[in-house]
Amino acid sequence: MARIDNKYRKLISKKAIGKELKLLGNETKDIFDLNFEVAYLIVKEILNLERNSNSDLSEIKKRIQDNLKIPGRMEKINGPNKTTILNDSYNANPDSFLAAFEFISKLKYKHKILVMGEMGELGEKSDQLHDLVIQKATKHFDFIFCVDINSKIKSEKINYLSKSDIVINLSRFFDKQTLILFKASRSVKMETLIDLI
């Protein structure tokens, strides 16, 4: 996996907006870690569009959208009772959590729920960074379920649970007005929880 740094993300967004690729202009800034081949495809398609003004924009959008469908990266799943589930369990770090929160804040749902797993490889500041993310989450979510995380942050919105308790606690929220974001580092295997729903 490769991280697209800010310089290239800005370049891609600028070119996308300039070419009215709304898919890129509005959404790519919220995707922080992209598969390198997908990043390459986006740049290649934009350059092709610049060289050939007769390019079919809808076909380019479709190719990019198809390649952006990476399991575990803001993958939309239809849950029980038409609940919207976003599986962002492929990887996690503080920046990607905050970007996901910003993205979620723009969506219109009656209930927004975060199921948060541990962020790996944060070193000595791990507890502090988890606390920071949890604190920020309280501003964007109605309920937060922290899976196997120890934190000092207290709030009526926050529940600290084990994996085995999550599904039972989530089931009362299943309806079409609810969005549930699952996000954690890959090592947490959050997709195993999603599979139980």
What residue ranges belong to the model's regions?
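ATP-dependent carboxylate-amine ligase
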Residues: 1-197
